[in-house]
Amino acid sequence: EGGALYQLLSLVDNTGEANTGIIIKGNDYTEKDLPVGTKVIVSLKYAKYDINNDLPQLRMATIFPTQEKVTMKVPQITVSQAGDYVGQYVTVKNLTPAANSTTWVVNKKTTSVNFTDDAELPMVARTTNHAVFANEAIAIKKADLSGIMEIYKGGYQIFPNSMEDVAGFKVE
């Protein structure tokens, strides 16, 4: 919805349980076209399952939106649980950004912001210049961060996608 997931959709069964989501790549829907929480029918007739840099995904799946809307069940997780929630929208609890963090996007280029949790486990937040919060300053404090959990070359990354996702790190 905020532009950070350009041509990516997170498809979940909305139970909030582990291992119930997957990324669908190559679809160019906007929040207006396909609002978060829209129940969909997915045709796999032309779809291809793919693993790209460790991230399981579907390519060329056909999405048929319905008129039915649901309230998303968002799992609250720790960094140690990230591997069970790849492809799902989650909230990661108690993250602290690195002391040198400035804004979500630096120099108008996709940016990784490093975080750690209470156990000092790392989590990377990836943000593209398309995100509505790209130029927002990051407060150096402990808070929760929401977004789509992904994996890239063995490391877990969260893609926040709205101002609400990053609200805990707003500079007051």
Predicted regions and their residues:
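OB-fold nucleic-acid-binding modules
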Residues: E1-E172
